[in-house]
């Protein structure tokens, strides 16, 4: 998904950085693996706060951000043994730097919905949509039965300062008439080498969406998990600021201890991270769906017409 969503750009950017390491050899959710995920997330979200906005109003440097050479340079900055400090992370694209005051950010709204669907003819849809806050603006359209959103909060009303959920943005995401606000939505469809769809996924979760989708892709493609295993696996999240790792129950005590020794600050997530809805096409052509149990009301349905 292109700007003004930041999802597609930074999903590709992070995968480009990570492809330079043998992640599978490190072991899923090992300290070495999580360290590299976190350092990659840290740099991508620093770029997000500075460079992303509505491309109709601001020249978003998409080509530079997803360039493999740029990813390789970011990878070289990562010490495999020691955590970086977010305060020390500088913008990577010097030629398009924009001034922005750095402030603490907290995970944004989780009032977002995602669904994935796949029919017998091979048509695939991965759809994410949101009202922003719970019940959006709290105003419904008379006799129409739907709520109006409050997406204005996704703008940087004052660049360099946090919005209602603590996310910091820059000049690129400032308010202007007719402009679209920045989001983290990352509806994703993956194609195999034969250019056939093999995976549809996405999730709600505000600023955690991009990292959730990335971990779903790594779980399925890198670690050969089935779609149910990939969905159930514990997740982590880092978003540059605040400088700590959010993690779900299930992360091993050994991994947490090693990460702390490396200098990371761990913050037990007060809630589960996202609620992915995914469909995976097996090599034999069968479709396997997985609805995330992190949120109530999820479901996976398969229907066959006579």
Label the predicted regions.
Residues 1-8, 116, 128-139, 202-210:
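Glycine-rich phosphate/pyrophosphate-binding beta-alpha loops
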Residues 5, 104-108, 173-182, 267-271:
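Short Gly/Pro-enriched turn/cap motifs at secondary-structure boundaries
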Residues 16-19, 203-225:
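Alpha-helical support elements that line or immediately flank enzyme active sites
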Residues 20-131, 143-144, 151, 158-161, ...:
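Internal maturation/activation junctions in enzymes
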Residues 109-112, 134, 183-185, 275:
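Short, small/polar residue-rich loop motifs at catalytic or cofactor-binding pockets
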Residues 121, 179-180, 213-214, 222-271:
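Extended C-terminal subregions enriched in glycine
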Residues 123-193, 223, 227:
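Active-site rim segments in enzyme catalytic domains, especially the processed small/beta chain
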